């Protein structure tokens, strides 16, 4: 039997691969410490800047000045510094010798990748010393680091194949938490983790998320997992330098680094090749796969081609407030890109003719306005004549909505030199679904833009876990193709409202303790208004299903949005309806929108539906169902949105897939599918869906649509049968912990399969129609008691812990692959959320204090047995959030002693006041420990974001004046210099936020 490979052997092979060939990485065995890395950096800096330095070496003081000025406090700031300007990173230096002129030092030159002044080196086992501030800290060694011009930019951590690659991931996170990536290592932008057989990469950040680990995919769509093959494909020169210089984006809002995925990079390269040949084309990337990010980098990178004067990201005017443009602006804030927010075409014309090679984001309408002004005025035409000679590249996101064939032809005719066009779409138009014939106008995407340059379909995105598949439920009863009137009757619409609320229990996640949102799309504004009233009437009458009221008493929170013209006489009725809808909305959310603020109202609806803003991440600030006609069915990104209800006839293939794609963003473990429910023409919908998926999913529905009920049921029964081998043999279950490893793996695999199958089948509404099914097709999900389930889970978790601890003795005689990082998908979904617990307590108070008051019978209140369960629910909730559960437990005990005391109080306010008091005490203590300003500390905590490496308000909090005051008051403090104090404050603030403030102030559901 061959000896197991060691990390040292893997490291040696990796370095051999990296240094193989000409112009690759050069091994530097002499660099083993941070001071040695700095010395090497300065040597390269001097070599590359002899002219600027006038051959006078840098003095120690000058080196100290430079290192202080360029060293940043976190990965994001360091990456921002390395972004430089015009693809070069420079640092100004005033020389110590006043007789020497100031130097403009070139640190990194991304215009000369694999040439010029670029120096590529690899080091390994660099020592990073422990902090003097922590007795528990220890020295560390980094496995392999790649340096460009002396700066560490890519860090590789290795584990041997008998350990999961996630151990390398966790090790890097541990080093980050220990501040080992400070100093010169803050320049790292890309992290690579591998166990030899599985390799992933991820952008550097203060808090790493395993969901963002990326597998490299080659041109043939095959994963590259083996670490030496990954090194050849990704870490060789020039590719590694391109990853840092060209395939990295800085998100200004989230203050984080983004690394592009393989398919995005391949699309950029395809466009780059086409543009060098003067060819146009389009990119077909599935909705939800990051088209905007890809198109942004395309727009930026095209400027590397000298023949292109400017690139223009072209949008339609009505898309200006869309998420696409907002995202583009956040990426552009750290780049040389001008986002056109000019009020008129005059300013745009000036920007076009200013001679700067940059990217403009503008609207088609403003460009057309320039043309018209030139046509109507010879003076203006002469002034802007040079615009006609520009060589432009147009980037068009959602390319069919932004530009029609007629509009594109008009733009082409204006310029003397044919512009290049690159369209991005998730739903290309083919011959099968071509536009209506109109003379010689382009009818397909290829005719309009040119050939497809890169393709990444829905099927690809689902396979890569970028988006979810779809679960289709055709509820319509009629198939009359010529009788739309049937679907406009009161009988049909009332039945649809009732059925929507019945289905919402599962489609919107309420059955599993979640609460996802939905869009409800109709064929007309009038129909949408009628549905809005029907939903409101149903809510007012208390006709929402009891099981929904039990878990979400205020479900559904409804809104409606549609376009209104102030000038059209026929829109008066629509305005009246919208006024009522605004009044309802203002009452529900305590807002004050008027008819003159419809734009703001629509944005607010979008924000509450998207739930990306911190303000809208609690249930009481969110919407459950938004009624629309066509609005929000394209270009809207809301990961929490799970369901699309359609009471309209089937749309064309491209619009159908666009609409469906609102539902299939990945959100959490409970969201298994994008749920689609149709209420009209079921046969036509089935045919339309098949046609759409044939066009957009590589010719079929496999892997894109959820399995039908019988398939999912069979999978559940098979998994249950495997688990029954243990349930029906208690002795086997009891002895599992001491059983051979092979038997333990078999149980773990069976338990994971059962959990997955159970989570999947809970999404089917057939579970609620079991009495309508033949006895042979019925299943019972309740025959495993909570006690037995807890026992099974306990055994499973113990076995997983044992397997992790005993990897060196792993039994390789079995092919059973156990996912040791598997997260329960169904078992833990039975947890009751805080909202439900508080509603039970609230209704208990109302019941106990009836004394002549009528209790609201439509709401749930604890029955005698349920009253006993409230304590159990609180204990269950404590597993996910003990700090908040502690306060709820105290209130519940107090309520039972004296319910009258709470008769005129909202228990939610009592809870928040109690939590606020504890939070204040925690912050007062933290402020006292470090001499911090309490108000500034409160501001930092209120705005803290773990994904943001530079929390808002932190720089003001750690001001030197507070350190000076602290040291004056505590002369014997361990913090004798400002930087030590500042670093410890940042660490403690993060720790207190993570372990105390966030759990206290965040409702876990």
Regions found by a protein language model. Give the residues of each.
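Conserved C-terminal RecA-like helicase domain
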Residues: 484-625
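Inter-Walker segment of RecA-like/P-loop motor cores
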Residues: 332-375
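Catalytic cores and motor modules of nucleic-acid processing enzymes
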Residues: 16-17, 23-25, 37, 46-49, ...
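Signature of the SF2 helicase/ATPase Hel1-core->accessory helical subdomain module
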Residues: 165-168, 204, 365-484, 493-494, ...
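Conserved helix-turn-beta segment of the N-terminal RecA-like "Helicase ATP-binding" lobe
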Residues: 318-344, 537-544
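Conserved RecA-like ASCE P-loop NTPase motor core of nucleic-acid helicases/translocases
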Residues: 283-284, 309-317, 516-524
């Amino acid at each position: 039997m061959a000896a197991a490979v060691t990390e040292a052997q893997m490291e040696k092979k990796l370095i051999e691969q990296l240094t193989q060939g000409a112009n690759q990485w050069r091994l530097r065995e002499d660099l083993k410490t941070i001071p040695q890395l700095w010395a090497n950096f300065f040597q390269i800096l001097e070599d590359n800047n002899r002219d600027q330095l006038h051959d006078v070496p840098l003095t120690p003081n000058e080196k100290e000045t430079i290192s202080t000025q360029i060293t940043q406090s976190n990965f994001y700031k360091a990456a921002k510094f390395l972004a430089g300007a015009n693809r070069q990173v420079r640092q100004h230096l005033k020389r110590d010798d006043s007789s020497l002129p100031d130097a403009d030092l070139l640190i990194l030159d991304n215009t000369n990748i694999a040439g010029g002044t670029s120096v590529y080196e690899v080091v390994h086992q660099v020592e990073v010393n422990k902090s003097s501030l922590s007795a528990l800290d220890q020295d560390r060694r980094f496995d392999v680091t790649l340096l460009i011009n002396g700066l560490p930019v890519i860090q590789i951590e290795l584990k041997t194949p008998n350990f999961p690659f996630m151990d390398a991931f966790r090790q890097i996170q541990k080093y980050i938490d220990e501040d080992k990536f400070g100093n010169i290592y803050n320049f790292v932008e890309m992290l690579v983790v591998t166990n030899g057989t599985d390799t992933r990469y991820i952008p550097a950040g203060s808090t790493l998320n395993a969901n963002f680990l990326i597998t490299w995919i080659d041109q043939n769509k095959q994963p590259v997992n083996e670490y030496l093959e990954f090194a050849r494909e990704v870490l060789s020169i020039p590719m590694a330098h391109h990853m840092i210089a060209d395939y990295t984006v800085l998100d200004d809002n989230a203050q984080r680094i983004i690394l592009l995925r393989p398919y995005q990079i391949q699309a950029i390269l395809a466009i780059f090749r086409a543009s060098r040949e003067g060819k146009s084309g389009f990119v077909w990337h599935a909705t939800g796969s990051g088209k905007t990010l890809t198109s942004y980098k395309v727009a930026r990178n095209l400027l590397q081609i000298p023949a292109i004067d400017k690139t223009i990201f072209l949008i339609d005017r009505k898309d200006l407030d869309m998420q696409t443009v907002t995202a583009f602006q956040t990426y552009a804030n750290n780049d040389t890109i001008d986002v056109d927010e000019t009020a008129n075409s005059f300013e745009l014309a000036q920007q076009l003719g200013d001679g700067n090679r940059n990217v403009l984001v503008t609207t088609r309408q403003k460009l057309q306005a320039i043309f018209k002004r030139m046509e109507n005025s010879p003076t203006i035409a002469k002034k802007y004549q040079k615009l006609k000679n520009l060589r432009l590249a147009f980037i068009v996101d959602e390319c069919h909505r932004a530009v029609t064939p007629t509009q594109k032809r008009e733009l082409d005719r204006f310029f003397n030199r044919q512009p290049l066009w690159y369209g991005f779409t998730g739903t290309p138009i083919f011959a099968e679904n071509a536009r209506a014939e109109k003379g010689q106008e382009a009818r397909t995407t290829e005719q309009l833009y040119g050939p497809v340059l890169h393709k990444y379909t829905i099927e690809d995105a689902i396979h890569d876990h970028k988006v979810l598949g779809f679960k289709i439920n055709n509820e319509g009863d009629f198939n009359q193709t010529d009788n739309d009137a049937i679907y406009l009757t009161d009988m049909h619409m009332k039945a649809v409202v009732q059925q929507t609320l019945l289905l919402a229990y599962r489609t919107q996640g309420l059955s599993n303790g979640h609460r996802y949102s939905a869009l409800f799309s109709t064929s007309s504004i009038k129909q949408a208004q009628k549905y809005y009233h029907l939903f409101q009437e149903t809510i007012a009458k208390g006709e929402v299903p009891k099981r929904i009221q039990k878990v979400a008493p205020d479900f559904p929170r409804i809104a409606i949005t549609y376009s209104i013209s102030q000038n059209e006489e026929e829109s008066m009725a629509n305005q009246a309806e919208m006024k009522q809808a605004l009044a309802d909305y203002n009452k529900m959310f305590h807002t004050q929108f008027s008819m003159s603020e419809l734009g703001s109202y629509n944005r607010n609806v979008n924000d509450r539906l998207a739930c990306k803003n911190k303000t809208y991440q609690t249930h009481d600030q969110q919407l459950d169902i938004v009624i629309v006609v066509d609005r929000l069915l394209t270009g809207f990104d809301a990961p929490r949105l799970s369901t699309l209800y359609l009471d309209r006839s089937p749309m064309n293939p491209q619009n159908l897939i666009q609409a469906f794609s609102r539902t299939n963003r990945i959100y959490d473990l409970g969201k298994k599918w994008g749920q689609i429910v149709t209420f009209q023409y079921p046969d036509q919908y089935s045919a339309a869906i098949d046609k759409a998926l044939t066009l957009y999913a590589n010719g079929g529905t496999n892997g894109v649509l959820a399995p039908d009920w019988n398939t999912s049921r069979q999978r559940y029964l098979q998994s249950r049968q495997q688990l029954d081998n243990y349930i029906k043999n208690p002795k086997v279950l009891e002895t599992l912990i001491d059983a051979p490893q092979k038997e333990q793996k078999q149980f773990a695999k069976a338990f994971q399969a059962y959990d997955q199958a159970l989570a999947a089948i809970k999404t089917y509404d057939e579970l609620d129609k079991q009495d309508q099914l033949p006895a042979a097709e019925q299943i019972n999900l309740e025959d495993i008691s909570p006690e037995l389930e807890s026992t099974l889970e306990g055994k499973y978790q113990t076995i997983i812990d044992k397997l992790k601890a005993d990897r060196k003795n792993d039994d390789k005689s079995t092919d059973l692959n156990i996912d040791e990082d598997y997260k329960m998908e169904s078992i833990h979904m039975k947890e009751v959320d805080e909202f439900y617990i508080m509603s039970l307590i609230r209704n208990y108070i109302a019941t106990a204090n009836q004394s002549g008051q009528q209790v609201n019978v439509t709401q749930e209140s604890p029955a005698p047995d349920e009253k006993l369960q409230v304590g159990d629910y609180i204990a269950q909730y404590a597993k996910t959030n003990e700090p908040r559960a502690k306060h709820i437990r105290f209130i519940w005990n107090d309520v039972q002693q004296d319910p009258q005391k709470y008769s005129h109080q909202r228990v939610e306010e009592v809870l928040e006041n109690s939590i606020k008091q504890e939070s204040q005490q925690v912050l007062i203590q933290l402020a006292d420990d470090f001499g911090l300003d309490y108000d500034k500390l409160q501001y930092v905590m209120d705005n803290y974001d773990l994904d943001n490496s530079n929390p808002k308000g932190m720089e003001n909090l750690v001001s030197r004046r507070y350190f000076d005051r602290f040291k004056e008051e505590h002369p014997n403090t361990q913090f004798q210099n400002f930087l030590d104090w500042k670093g410890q404050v940042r660490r403690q603030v993060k720790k207190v936020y993570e372990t105390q403030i966030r759990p206290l102030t965040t409702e876990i559901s």
